[in-house]
Amino acid sequence: GIVEGLMTTVHAITATQKTVDGPSGKLWRDGRAAAQNIIPASTGAAKAVGKVIPELNGKLTGMAFRVPTPNVSVVDLTCRLEKPAKYDDIKKVVKQASEGSLKGILGYTEDQVVSCDFNSDTH
């Protein structure tokens, strides 16, 4: 099982971001031009995962980066596990979940893809 983890989400541009540098009511960097910058941001994704997967509640922290791409986001999850695990074993479990209990929710591929290849992906 997972002892603790850090979720780093990489988000595509959203409609709430600025097209050019300007003032922001929240944080100074939220006013920076979205298409020219990688913008660190906060995220509630880690807490949301804990609500959907109760076993992970309180075990994940999160951070986000807004990047200049029009669509598709990704999550990098780094975990400390209760027991040692090999990379190939982790991939096998994730692939099995994508074909079983998380089918239609979690996608898995080892193809050499880039973000726009997922534009019509429903996961």
Curated annotation (Swiss-Prot):
Q: Does the keyword Membrane apply?
A: no
What protein is this chain from? Glyceraldehyde-3-phosphate dehydrogenase
Involved pathway(s): Carbohydrate degradation; glycolysis; pyruvate from D-glyceraldehyde 3-phosphate: step 1/5
Could you list the residue ranges that cross the membrane?
Answer: none
Carrying S-nitrosocysteine, the residues are 79
Q: Where is this site: Activates thiol group during catalysis?
A: 11
Q: Which residues carry this modification: Phosphothreonine?
A: 9, 14, 16, 43, 61, 69
Function statement: Has both glyceraldehyde-3-phosphate dehydrogenase and nitrosylase activities, thereby playing a role in glycolysis and nuclear functions, respectively. Glyceraldehyde-3-phosphate dehydrogenase is a key enzyme in glycolysis that catalyzes the first step of the pathway by converting D-glyceraldehyde 3-phosphate (G3P) into 3-phospho-D-glyceroyl phosphate. Modulates the organization and assembly of the cytoskeleton. Facilitates the CHP1-dependent microtubule and membrane associations through its ability to stimulate the binding of CHP1 to microtubules.
On modification after translation, the UniProt record reads: ISGylated. S-nitrosylation leads to interaction with SIAH1, followed by translocation to the nucleus. S-nitrosylation is induced by interferon-gamma and LDL(ox) implicating the iNOS-S100A8/9 transnitrosylase complex and seems to prevent interaction with phosphorylated RPL13A and to interfere with GAIT complex activity.
Q: Where does D-glyceraldehyde 3-phosphate bind?
A: 14, 43-44, 66
Q: Which GO terms describe its molecular function?
A: glyceraldehyde-3-phosphate dehydrogenase (NAD+) (phosphorylating) activity; microtubule binding; peptidyl-cysteine S-nitrosylase activity
Q: Where in the cell is it found?
A: Cytoplasm, Cytosol; Cytoplasm, Cytoskeleton; Nucleus
Q: Which residues carry this modification: Phosphoserine?
A: 73
* Main location per the UniProt record: cytoplasm
Which biological processes are named by the entry's GO terms? Answer: glycolytic process; innate immune response; microtubule cytoskeleton organization; neuron apoptotic process; peptidyl-cysteine S-trans-nitrosylation; positive regulation of canonical NF-kappaB signal transduction; positive regulation of type I interferon production; protein stabilization
Q: Site of the Glycyl lysine isopeptide (Lys-Gly) (interchain with G-Cter in SUMO2) crosslink?
A: 18
Give all N6-acetyllysine modified positions: 26, 51, 59, 86
Q: Which Pfam families match?
A: Gp_dh_C
- Annotated S-S bridges: none
Q: What lineage does UniProt assign to this protein's organism?
A: Eukaryota, Metazoa, Chordata, Craniata, Vertebrata
According to its record, what is known about the domains? The [IL]-x-C-x-x-[DE] motif is a proposed target motif for cysteine S-nitrosylation mediated by the iNOS-S100A8/A9 transnitrosylase complex.
GO cellular component terms attached to this protein's record:
cytoplasm; cytosol; GAIT complex; microtubule cytoskeleton; nucleus
Write down which residues bear the modification named N6-malonyllysine.
Answer: 26, 47
Coiled-coil annotation: which residues?
none
